[in-house]
């Protein structure tokens, strides 16, 4: 299996240093977390069960439908677009290598091992990575991070003390907006005091002017 990893690294042609870290470190098993620079961690993603993530094919179709123009653009759009490009390129190289190994291995057992390893281990990591960056682009990074924390708290709470259904990512933006509005109310309540002071100042000036006239 280490030989397979070595072939994977040699064949991976990702264009940037960050993508090289993804292929050399994350898929190799080094302690490199591709989510840290985005405020998340591998452990935070691991709270989501494997069947939560759509298939790679569905995720690639979603990325193409929503962000194809930005992904194909030579310009730098955002770190999430860049990471998404790199993940797509890495997965393409992984599948090409797995296909090559599968067609050139005479032993059916070894062929099945390679295919299962790619689909189970590397496939899950790529599904997590694609889902994370697509979700950040769609809902916003802060919303996704809030969802991961909420789901982590929910899944670790005993069933008797938690809601029956897990949090839903698509409903979090509504609660986020409400919270922002609630946070914005406190300064608004404080604003009348300076206004009253300002409104009082002309009155005082008028009273002073009247006294001077008298």
UniProtKB/Swiss-Prot annotation:
Record family assignment: Belongs to the orthohepadnavirus precore antigen family.
Region entry Disordered, spans: 165-214
Subcellular location: Secreted; Host nucleus
Native organism taxonomy: Viruses, Riboviria, Pararnavirae, Artverviricota, Revtraviricetes
Sequence repeat boundaries on the chain: 186-192, 193-200, 201-208
Assembly behavior: Homodimerizes.
Positions of region (HBEAG): 25-27
Protein's name according to its UniProt entry: External core antigen
InterPro entries reported in the protein's UniProt record: Hepatitis_B_virus_capsid_N, Hepatitis_core, Viral_capsid_core_dom_sf_HBV
């Amino acid at each position: 299996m280490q030989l397979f990893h070595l072939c994977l690294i040699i064949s991976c042609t990702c264009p940037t240093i960050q993508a090289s870290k993804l292929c050399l470190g994350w898929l190799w098993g080094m302690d490199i977390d591709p989510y840290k620079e985005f405020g998340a961690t591998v452990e935070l993603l691991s709270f989501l069960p494997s069947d939560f993530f759509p298939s790679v094919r569905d995720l690639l179709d979603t990325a193409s439908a929503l962000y194809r123009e930005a992904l194909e653009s030579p310009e730098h759009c955002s770190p999430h677009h860049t990471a998404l490009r790199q993940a797509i390129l890495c997965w393409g190289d992984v599948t090409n290598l797995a296909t090559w190994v599968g067609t050139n291995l005479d032993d059916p057992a070894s062929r099945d091992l390679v295919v299962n390893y790619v689909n189970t281990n590397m496939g899950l990591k790529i599904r997590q990575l694609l889902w994370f960056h697509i979700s950040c682009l769609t809902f916003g990074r802060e919303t996704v991070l809030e969802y991961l924390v909420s789901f982590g708290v929910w899944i670790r709470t005993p069933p008797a003390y938690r809601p029956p259904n897990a949090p839903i990512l698509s409903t979090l933006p509504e609660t986020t907006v409400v919270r922002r509005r609630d946070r914005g109310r406190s300064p608004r309540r404080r604003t009348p005091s300076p206004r009253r002071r300002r409104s009082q100042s002309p009155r005082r000036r008028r009273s002073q002017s009247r006294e001077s006239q008298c």
